[in-house]
Regions:
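Short helix-perturbing small/polar motifs within transmembrane alpha-helices
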Residues: 4, 10-31, 37, 41-44, ...
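Small-residue-rich segments of transmembrane alpha-helices in multi-pass membrane proteins
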Residues: 74-79, 165-174
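Hydrophobic transmembrane alpha-helices
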Residues: 2-90, 98
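C-terminal TM-helix exit segments that contain a strictly Trp-centered aromatic cap at the helix terminus
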Residues: 95, 99-100, 169-178
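Alpha-helical membrane segments and adjacent membrane-interface helices in multi-pass membrane proteins
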Residues: 53-144
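Hydrophobic alpha-helical membrane segments of integral membrane proteins
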Residues: 60, 64, 161, 172-175
Length: 178
């Protein structure tokens, strides 16, 4: 694998990897899409993952809620590719860090509800240092992995295997974190 540094006006290619052969699915469907639309789609993807995080239930004896966040993250990697999928997931994290209620727990949104810094730190520690922190780390790994695999020329029919591996990559850091 050879790493190539290149500049491009039409992409956010800071460091391109030469083995990436295909465009993301969204760019393949809409070849004339601009970066502004891709950025807007990445923001929409973060909103989608935020919405899917709110659809949750708890299994008895398990402190981690069961949500559809993982599905949303897998779709982001598959549709947006590894670069824009990563932008979307990072925007999701930054939204949670500033206090927007995007995570699947009760201690969220403290910055805009209560300006008491101790409450903000408590919410931050609960989300990122608590039992769900490993899942959040796995979201980044899975999005980049799925986007890279799909852009590396895997057949669209074999996408299910990359999604299964992506799910595995979400759960490995989560289990280690617990």
């Amino acid at each position: 694998m050879q790493y190539v540094i290149r500049r491009s006006v039409n992409s956010i290619d800071f460091v391109g990897i030469s083995s990436v052969k295909e465009k993301p699915l969204l760019v393949a469907i809409f070849p004339t899409i601009s970066n502004w639309y891709l950025f807007g789609t990445a923001i929409f993807g973060a909103v989608l993952v935020s919405f899917l995080a709110q659809l949750k239930f708890y299994l008895p004896g398990n402190p981690v809620p069961v949500t559809l966040q993982g599905f949303g993250v897998l779709v982001l990697g598959g549709v947006l590719g590894w670069k824009w999928g990563l932008v979307s997931v990072l925007f999701y994290f930054i939204s949670g860090l500033v206090g927007l209620p995007v995570f699947a727990n009760e201690n969220q949104g403290n910055l805009f509800i209560n300006l008491d810094i101790s409450e903000v730190v408590k919410g931050y520690n609960y989300v990122f240092m608590g039992v769900t922190g490993g899942y959040l780390l796995g979201f980044i790994v899975a999005t980049v992995f799925i986007g890279f695999i799909i852009q590396s020329g895997w057949n669209r029919g074999a996408t299910i295997w990359s999604m299964l591996l992506g799910s595995f990559l979400i759960y490995v850091p989560a289990l280690i974190w617990l």
